Swiss-Prot record:
PANTHER family: NEUTRAL PROTEASE 2-RELATED, PTHR37016
GO MF entries: metal ion binding; metalloendopeptidase activity
Disulfide-bonded cysteines: 184-255, 262-280
Catalytic activity: Preferential cleavage of bonds with hydrophobic residues in P1'. Also 3-Asn-|-Gln-4 and 8-Gly-|-Ser-9 bonds in insulin B chain
Residues of the active site: 305
Family to which this protein belongs: Belongs to the peptidase M35 family.
Protein name: Neutral protease 2 homolog MEP2
SUPFAM superfamilies in UniProt: Metalloproteases ('zincins'), catalytic domain
Binding site for Zn(2+): 304, 308, 319
Keywords of this entry: Cleavage on pair of basic residues, Disulfide bond, Hydrolase, Metal-binding, Metalloprotease, Protease, Secreted, Signal, Virulence, Zinc, Zymogen
Length: 362
């Protein structure tokens, strides 16, 4: 993992939703129907099927105004490479403006263009599908009370590749002429180094726990067979390795926002297509490591973000769900590729704040 001295100006981005096979849609309190309204432009019709109001968090789903991936795109049964942003959201002290309320039976529509975050220039047959769990609050409050799962229909498309290639991309290529001096200095640098130290420690401990406690693996990942455990251990060990070096590795880490994506309650974000991690200002307000079960802190944020980077471990993790209640609604396939599942598993019980001496070089 590198602290670069130069970085390109980062433009608008996006956020993965799905991977692997496409399951059939089933009943849910939230109905999502996808339809095509252009070559690569999609309309999502979201209906509250519950008998109560749903007060949904806007981030990382169809209601997000940011350039995140609203649906997975597939060609020949395989996910198309995603080029966009994944953000980690602080799940407390949420502003009312970060929620959208749907009354029972209410329907809203959202539109997005899948070509802005995927290369569809080859054209031909594609499938689009979305699935996940959206956090919600209750009444007039903004405290997350749970998560509502959803599965959309599978939308088949015949895409004109030449037309798709004309859609503006959400992320611009790196320009060697656009340089920003390193901002990882002083107190921010020391804070991040300490968080990386704990990230390495937590990741290694979690990898060992996965091998020794299949009951806990089942609780968080919905499955505990040998292949599942092997994947979990390999990913966590890869995160530990990436956390243990600041002058080499697969990722670049920025202490300050360079893409103007640090919206309210965004702790950090990752650009998986570039293997870049960026901290937002509120990252530095969090404790380096927390003794509270499932709490968000700097160390688990580093762990969380590194699981998003294909250079660390591929296939990289998405943001299918947030929080313990949310991850418990995922399928085993989704859980294995969900970033918050790993960070929650790693701090699923209070941690000692003793620090081992990692050889962190800068």
């Amino acid at each position: 993992m590198l602290f670069p001295s130069i970085v390109a100006a980062l433009a608008a981005l996006a956020n993965p939703v799905l991977s692997l096979t496409i399951p059939q849609a089933t009943g849910s309190e939230l109905d999502v129907q996808l339809s095509a309204i252009g070559n690569t432009r999609i309309k999502a019709v979201i209906t509250n099927k519950a008998d109560r109001q749903l007060k949904l968090l806007k981030y990382n789903n169809f209601f997000d105004d940011g350039p995140i991936q609203k649906a997975g795109v597939f060609k020949d049964g395989q996910p198309v490479k995603f080029e966009g942003m994944l953000r980690r959201v602080l799940m407390k002290n949420l502003e009312p403006s970060l929620f959208v309320s749907l009354s029972p039976g209410q329907t809203v529509e959202r539109e997005f263009d899948i070509a802005s975050t995927a290369d569809l220039a080859s054209g031909g047959a594609y499938s689009v599908f979305s699935q996940g769990a959206i956090p919600f609050a209750e009444g007039d409050g903004t405290t997350i009370a749970g998560a509502v799962a959803f599965k959309s229909n599978k939308l088949d498309l015949d895409i004109d590749g030449a037309l798709a290639a004309t859609v503006s991309k959400a992320i611009n290529p790196i320009s060697a002429r656009t340089r920003v001096e390193s901002a990882c200095r002083g107190e921010q640098r020391e804070t991040l180094l300490k968080a990386l130290e704990y990230s390495a420690q937590l990741s290694r401990a979690a990898a060992q726990a996965a091998q020794n406690n299949t009951r806990k693996v089942e609780e968080y990942f919905m499955k505990s067979d040998a292949q599942t455990v092997e994947t979990i251990v390999a990913r966590l060990n890869a995160v530990a390795q990436e956390s243990s070096s600041t002058d080499s590795g697969a990722t670049r880490y920025f202490c300050n926002d360079r893409g103007n994506q640090c919206t309210p309650n965004t702790i950090a974000y990752t650009l998986p297509s570039l293997n870049v991690v960026v901290n937002c200002p509120i990252y530095y307000d969090l404790p380096v490591i927390s003794d509270e079960c499932h709490a968000q802190d700097q160390a688990t944020t580093c762990l969380h973000e590194f699981t998003h980077n294909p250079g660390v471990y591929d296939p990289y993790c998405r943001d299918h769900a947030y929080g313990y209640d949310g991850i418990r609604k995922l399928s085993p396939e989704q859980a294995l590729l969900n970033a918050d599942t790993y960070s929650l598993f790693a701090n699923g019980k209070p941690k000692s704040q003793t620090t081992s001496n990692f050889n962190l070089k800068f």
